[in-house]
C-alpha cells in the first residue's frame, strides 16, 4: 500500500502511542523523519530516538517522554502543511504556537528548524507541524 503522507503517519503514531502510554513507538525511517525526531528531542518533547537498520528502509524507534510517568509531554501534535495543501510562510509571518509554549517545525533551506530559530535566522519555509 502506498502511503501518501509519511510525516502525518509519524505524527499520528507518536500521538497514539502517547495516549496509550507506550514507552516507545516504531516508525518506518526516512531522512526527513530522523530530522523531525532530532528537532523533537532538542525541544524536549521526546526522550530519545534511534535508527534500527533492517534489510529494507530501516526503523525509527522513538522513546516518548512522560510527566510523572502518567501524562505524555506532547499535549497536541498537529500536521499543518499537507500534500493537498502546502502552507508556506515568510520569516515575518511566522506565528507563535500557544503564545510561545509550543513550537512550529518548519522545513527551510537550512533544514528542519523551529519557528523561533527561523525567526532569528530570518528565513521562512513550509510549516510541517505544530507541537505543544
UniProtKB/Swiss-Prot annotation:
Q: Which GO terms describe its biological process?
A: translation
* Protein species of origin: Citrifermentans bemidjiense (strain ATCC BAA-1014 / DSM 16622 / JCM 12645 / Bem)
The opening ranks of the lineage are:
Bacteria, Pseudomonadati, Thermodesulfobacteriota, Desulfuromonadia, Geobacterales
Name of protein? Small ribosomal subunit protein uS8
Q: What does this protein's UniProt record list under function?
A: One of the primary rRNA binding proteins, it binds directly to 16S rRNA central domain where it helps coordinate assembly of the platform of the 30S subunit.
User: Does the record carry Ribonucleoprotein as a key word?
Assistant: yes
Question: Which Gene Ontology terms cover its molecular function?
Answer: rRNA binding; structural constituent of ribosome
Tell me which GO cellular component terms the UniProt record holds: ribonucleoprotein complex; ribosome
Fetch the HAMAP family from UniProt.
Answer: Ribosomal_uS8_B
Amino acid at each position: 500500500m502506498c502511503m501518501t503522507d509519511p510525516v502525518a503517519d509519524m505524527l499520528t503514531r507518536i500521538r497514539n502511542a502517547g495516549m496509550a502510554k507506550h514507552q516507545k513507538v516504531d516508525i518506518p525511517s526516512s531522512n526527513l523523519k530522523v530530522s523531525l525526531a532530532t528537532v523533537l528531542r532538542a525541544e524536549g518533547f521526546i526522550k530519545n530516538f534511534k535508527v534500527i537498520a533492517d534489510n529494507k528502509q530501516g526503523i525509527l524507534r522513538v522513546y516518548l517522554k512522560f510527566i510523572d510517568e502518567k501524562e505524555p509531554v506532547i499535549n497536541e501534535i498537529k500536521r499543518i502543511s499537507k500534500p493537498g495543501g502546502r502552507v508556506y510562510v515568510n520569516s515575518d509571518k511566522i506565528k507563535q504556537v500557544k503564545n510561545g509554549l509550543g513550537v512550529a517545525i518548519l522545513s527551510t533551506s537550512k533544514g528542519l528548524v523551529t519557528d523561533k530559530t527561523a525567526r532569528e535566522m530570518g528565513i521562512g519555509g513550509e510549516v510541517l507541524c505544530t507541537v505543544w
